[in-house]
Swiss-Prot record:
Domain of life: Bacteria
Entry-linked Pfam families: Ribosomal_L9_C, Ribosomal_L9_N
GO molecular function: rRNA binding; structural constituent of ribosome
Protein name, UniProt field: Large ribosomal subunit protein bL9
Organism: Prosthecochloris aestuarii (strain DSM 271 / SK 413)
């Protein structure tokens, strides 16, 4: 019997896949547990429609991420921080500070998407990697300046 998996099943496959299983396994376990549904013509068409909608949605997100990446690539963020006379910071500039500075510039990015090569502990120019989508990332220039 052909079924459409609704959940990931370790021995069969991932959600959304159409697999062929024995009638008893489908009728007595997979379907009652909500792990699968019968692969009727209507269900297969609905699955195909859902996949197309999902692909469209992912493409829209990718286009939006590329637009944000272009905007970020051209920016130079200025992050103020308290520093001593030698240029050493009192504390560090982290991804949270960079995310806050981006938010001020009108770009809302989750701090966990920002990657620094090393913690920023001195005044100067640095670069940070911002992962915006599965295959879209941007490098942003960060200038750490003395406060006040």
């Amino acid at each position: 019997m052909k079924v459409i998996l609704r959940k990931n099943v370790a021995s069969l496959g991932d959600a959304g896949e159409v697999v062929d299983v024995k009638n008893g396994y489908a009728n007595n376990y997979l379907i009652p547990q909500g792990m699968a549904a019968r692969a009727t013509d209507g269900a297969l068409k609905a699955l195909e429609t859902e996949r197309k909608q999902q692909a469209r949605k992912i493409e829209q997100q990718r286009v939006a991420a590329r637009a944000i990446a272009e905007k970020i690539q051209q920016m130079t963020l200025k992050v103020p921080a308290r520093a001593g006379e030698s240029g050493k910071l009192f504390g560090t500039v982290t991804s949270v500070n960079i995310a806050d500075a981006l938010k001020v510039e009108g770009v809302d990015v989750d701090r966990r998407k920002i990657t620094l090569d090393a913690p920023i502990r001195a005044l100067g120019n640095y670069e940070a990697e911002v992962k915006l989508f599965m295959d879209v990332s941007a490098t942003i220039k960060v200038t750490v300046e003395a406060e006040g």
